[in-house]
Amino acid sequence: MKVLIIYATTEGQTRKISEHVADQLREAGHEVALRHCADWQSDFHIGEFDRVILAGSVHQKRHQRELEIFVPAHLSELAGKPTLFISVSLFAAYPDGMAEAQTYVDEFLETAKWRPSGVVLAAGALRYDEYDYFMEQIVRHVVLEGREDAGSRGEHEFTDWKALSDEVNAFVDPDPA
């Protein structure tokens, strides 16, 4: 099966997730193409693939602008394929944040007029060493809002790799024999 993975990333966690999914699918014997949506080439056609996975992350209550542009621009091609949307956010790291994470997905899909076959809410990562003071304050006081953040320095990854792999397997092979 030919699978296309298209992603947008801000701090690199969505790229890491997309690479993980690509490796998982290749190991299962699938042919995989991995592309950043900003690097999309006009001679590359979604129609060549059996399934399409799009991944993006939430920052300041919305997904990346390039993903917001990409999806509507390719909506007719996406509509004819089984598609999976992986939305990465810190809200998905906490049970009480899942509803908010879903709200950002719903807003994105409504604006894009896209109805993927499936949606995965994946927890992101904290990268304190890459944040300036302003971004660190947003993370602490808006995103985390008193939640435990596993420390205040370095990188803290919240992605549940097994759950992600299980969701991707179910999408690619919905009827395992």
Question: Could you describe each region identified by the protein language model?
Answer:
Residues 2-28:
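N-terminal beta1-alpha1 ligand-phosphate binding loop
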Residues 3, 32-33, 83, 117:
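Hydrophobic anchor at the start of a short beta-strand
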Residues 6, 35-37, 122-124:
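Conserved beta-strand termini and adjacent loop/short-helix elements that scaffold enzyme active sites
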Residues 8-12, 39-40, 57-61:
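Short, surface-exposed acidic/glycine-rich loop or hinge patches that mediate macromolecular interfaces
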Residues 16, 49-52, 56, 60-177:
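FMN-binding flavodoxin-like domain, especially the glycine-rich phosphate-binding loop
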Residues 24-29, 173-177:
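Secondary-structure boundary elements
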Residues 28-41:
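A short beta-strand-loop structural module common to alpha/beta enzyme folds
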Residues 41-47:
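Short amphipathic alpha-helix with an adjacent loop that forms part of the alpha/beta core around
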